[in-house]
Curated annotation (Swiss-Prot):
Zn(2+) 2 binds at residues 153, 187, 224, 269. It comes from Chlamydia muridarum (strain MoPn / Nigg). Zn(2+) 1 binds at residues 75, 115, 153. Keywords: DNA damage, DNA repair, Endonuclease, Hydrolase, Metal-binding, Nuclease, Zinc. This is Probable endonuclease 4.
Amino acid sequence: MFVLPPPQEPLLGAHTSAAGGLHNALYEGRDIGATTIQLFTANQRQWKRRSLTQNMIEQFQTALDETSLSYIMSHAGYLNNPGAPNPEILEKTRICMYQEIADCIALGISFVNFHPGAALSDSKESCLDRAITSFSQMAPLFETNPPLVVLLETTAGQGSLIGSSFEELAYLIQGIKAHIPVGVCLDTCHIFAAGYDISSPEGWEQVLKHFDEVIGLSFLRAIHLNDSIFPLGKNKDRHAPIGEGCIGSESFCFLMRDERTRKLPKYLETPGGPDLWTKEIRYLQKVS
């Protein structure tokens, strides 16, 4: 199984808009000074995906060449629930996952990021096992060894969501890794909301040590950069601009400098849009 190597240089960007065409997300990334981006490859709030055309693929490839952006990440749709207890929703999710991954391969995207799932009326244990099956069923798409990694995003621990603890993510990875290339996208707001104190370099040291012991740092492939409106451990997923929330700017400076995290692709999801992202990218590059 081919495993995409990590980038050789630090990459920083944001979740940009694909309005008017997927390629436009790449051009917006260039305009804000990014070296990578995240985007939705389809409407994130609908089950039905439009089919990629050869023209769409060619436009995207041209934009990749013209912008020199790399390690592009697709964020899968919000309706997906890989661990859904409802058979109908589970089947819809698996179809959508398959289409999402196939499109990412066609476009030459490096990462596809999924929320691991929600147990809803069922146990988290059963949800975790269904999610493992869902992701493992994507194996046929990887028989040609495409340079794509499926990422499981850390969650804030709200409701019945799985993936808020490193232990749950480790369980998922152990069940999936023999079938498809898999890793973790660490969302700073989410892990802070889930109780991991990353508001200081000392806190990060403990969290990274714990991550390495439970999952392994080799599985940490990308980071969502978001400050948090709410204090530590509140299980609330509310993003704030960098340095304007309860995590604080010191935490993000650490990520930009520490050798374990410096070169990991990082994607801003902060509220404020392109003008804010331009300022945040400049700031983070300055402190790196």
